[in-house]
Amino acid sequence: RDLRYFHPNVRPDTHNRLLQECDEAFRRSNEIFVQHFRTKYTSEPYPPLWMMAEVMTYGQLFTMYRQLRNQEQKAIARSIGLQAPVLESWLHTLNYIRNAVAHHARLWNRQIPVRPMMPAQRHRPEFYTPLPIANDRMFGVLSLLRYMLSQVAPQSQWPQRLISLLDDYPDIPRLSMDFPEDWRDYSLWTL
């Protein structure tokens, strides 16, 4: 809420509108943790950010990240081994993907118009071994998700579930999604 954490170019009315939307989402929520907060912390006007993030839309989270000062963005990106512009581009791509999925859009053979920036090879060589991962098809998007999950939830079974899904449906046209034949052997997928 404190404008000191946000970029000086963010207009206060824009920032306040975002906060009002987030507050409204929290007020509407019937989640158990929200009910607990309301009953136990009656003197607290606002919930902690981790709690608020649970009820915010992806678009609101993305907007909040974009409004942060560069220093704050860098700290968040660094915590998952990325540079801030790379993380912002990934969040933008994932916002596009999320909206496409919500509207039942076809993605499997689509060229992704909101392309994620790939990290520099010297910072993240796993995106380049054995070959560079392209950023315009679903394999690139799935690869960045794989990387992010390895950083924030290393115990996640999502990579194994994706592999099982593709094994269960061998007729899925992987080439249209830019999956290389040996994708399972790529450094990123063996983390």
Give residue ranges: language-model regions.
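Long, contiguous internal "core" modules enriched in hydrophobic/ aromatic residues
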Residues: 1-191
